[in-house]
Curated annotation (Swiss-Prot):
Entry's family note: Belongs to the adenylosuccinate synthetase family.
Disulphide-bonded residues: none
Matches recorded under InterPro entries: Adenylosuccin_syn_GTP-bd, Adenylosuccin_syn_Lys_AS, Adenylosuccinate_synth_dom1, Adenylosuccinate_synth_dom2, Adenylosuccinate_synth_dom3, Adenylosuccinate_synthetase, P-loop_NTPase
Organism: Finegoldia magna (strain ATCC 29328 / DSM 20472 / WAL 2508) (Peptostreptococcus magnus)
Name assigned to this protein: Adenylosuccinate synthetase
Pfam families xrefs: Adenylsucc_synt
Role this protein plays: Plays an important role in the de novo pathway of purine nucleotide biosynthesis. Catalyzes the first committed step in the biosynthesis of AMP from IMP.
Matches recorded under PANTHER family: ADENYLOSUCCINATE SYNTHETASE
Residues reported in the UniProt entry to bind Mg(2+): 13, 40
Active site, UniProt feature: 13 (proton acceptor), 41 (proton donor)
Any single GO CC term annotated in Swiss-Prot or TrEMBL for this entry: cytoplasm
Any GO MF annotation of the entry: adenylosuccinate synthase activity
Entry keyword annotation includes GTP-binding: yes
Species classification: Bacteria, Bacillati, Bacillota, Tissierellia, Tissierellales
Assembly with partners or alone: Homodimer.
Length: 418
């Protein structure tokens, strides 16, 4: 059965949570396979706001399931908090979530380590300080804890003792980790998750279910934050392209839909390249209209015009074959709207950067459009049609508000143009 992957095509915060929540009603299993609690997906259901940092964005009023795959790093305490919020409104919903036992864990000392490393950097990256980088770092260094380790108290203690010995020697005088506190923390949180009814399994165990059912892969962050293809070093510590689906033992094919979520403008959290960034009053206006404040950190997001050169790069890196345009309504009321159609790099005009380092030297080339007061006006359609043609990729859906139902297929959207 064909699969659907929904990924951010910019620097994250494109509105993936709402889009995933909309499409989850047509799918049986929603899979998250990368990142951790550094992602923030906001969902509105019956006029109530829910913010997920870890949980896949399942549909609350269906029987869809969520699967946290082994490409993630999971902060157990955060997961418990999110489940308890949902349990208050949807009793028993925790039983609809599955976790791969081979998934690695974000521990309290990872957060401390994250802050320590950030404070020591000459040029801070602007991390969320949720411990994501150190957790992935420990995974690669073979010194982290996995969910499967929690099933055996004795082996868990041995594992933690070895890790703590290394950490305390590396960070002597900077931070100190206690073995008993760490073990007790892990066992307590694991017990709480079991009592909530979370299922612990593996991609291999549910292989037939994933193969034969309708599956949606929910991306985290955006392609421009990908560890390999993003604006390094100002990136996250995991894969943010559609290829992260391999962590659930799935290989996406040309027959599957890889849907890129594209905001009608652009935003970014933290440091790093941002060719179309706006400043001062222009930035404040767009930030306020779009409510561009981080769901994870609360920080002001940097904002700017939509960037087609960046999007061409993202489409190529993740083989995007469909686009959802979000937050189209935020630009309502602008007299003029700009679109970056390419870059000047070292004095040469380019439609798309060839490598991520090119973003450091990019000077945007703009085309200006007449604005609109409502997305159902012909001027917005002209804006959208131009973008679609330039990217050579169909904008198949348009999202025009925060509610899950405020999304339309393009053909229906066009029929409503005044």
């Amino acid at each position: 059965m064909n699969k659907l992957a929904i990924i951010g095509a910019q620097w994250g915060d494109e509105g993936k949570g709402k889009v995933v929540n909309y499409f989850s009603q047509f799918n049986d299993i929603i899979v998250r396979s990368s990142g951790g609690a550094n992602a923030g997906h906001t969902i509105y259901f019956k006029d109530k706001k829910y913010v997920h940092h870890l949980l896949p964005s399942i549909t609350f009023d269906t029987d869809s399931k969520g699967f946290l795959a082994k490409g993630m790093v999971i902060e157990l305490e955060q997961m418990i908090e999110e489940l308890k919020v949902l349990e208050a409104d949807f009793p028993g919903i925790s039983k609809r979530f599955m976790v791969d036992v081979e998934t690695f864990i974000v521990l309290p000392y990872h957060k401390e380590e994250d802050g320590l490393l950030e404070s020591m950097r000459k040029n801070p990256i602007g991390t969320t300080k949720r411990g994501i980088g150190p957790a992935y770092q420990d995974k690669a260094a073979r010194q982290n804890v996995r969910i499967i380790d929690l099933f055996d108290d004795e082996l868990l203690r041995e594992r933690v003792e070895e890790i703590v010995y290394l950490k305390n020697n590396i960070y002597e005088g900077k931070m100190h980790i206690d073995v008993d506190e760490t073990v007790n923390y892990l066992l307590d949180k694991f017990d709480q998750l079991l009592k909530l009814g979370v299922t612990f399994t593996s991609a291999s165990e549910i292989e037939d279910e994933i193969k034969n059912k309708r599956v949606l892969f929910e991306g985290a962050q955006g392609i421009m934050l990908d560890l390999d293809s993003g604006t390094y070093p100002y990136v996250t510590s995991s894969t943010t392209t559609a290829y992260s689906a391999s962590c659930a033992d799935v290989t996406l094919t040309d027959d599957d839909t890889i849907m890129g979520v594209v905001k009608a403008y652009t935003s970014r959290v933290g440091e790093g390249e941002f060719p179309t960034e706006l400043f001062d009053e222009e930035a404040d206006k767009l930030r306020k209209l779009g409510n561009e404040f981080g769901a994870t950190t609360g920080r002001n997001r940097r904002v700017g015009w939509i960037d087609l050169a960046q999007l061409r790069y993202a489409i190529k890196k993740s083989k995007i074959n469909s686009i959802v345009m979000t937050k189209a309504d935020v630009l309502n009321g602008y007299d003029k709207v700009k679109v970056c159609v390419g870059y000047e790099i070292d004095g040469v005009e380019q439609k798309m950067p060839f490598i991520s380092n090119d973003f450091k030297k990019a000077k945007p080339i703009y085309k200006e459009f007449d604005g609109w007061n409502d997305v159902f006006e012909v001027n917005f359609l002209k804006y959208m049609t131009f973008i679609e043609k330039e990217l050579d990729t169909e904008i198949s859906y348009v999202s025009y508000g925060p509610k899950t139902e405020e999304i339309m297929e393009k053909r229906d959207f066009i029929m409503n143009i005044k």
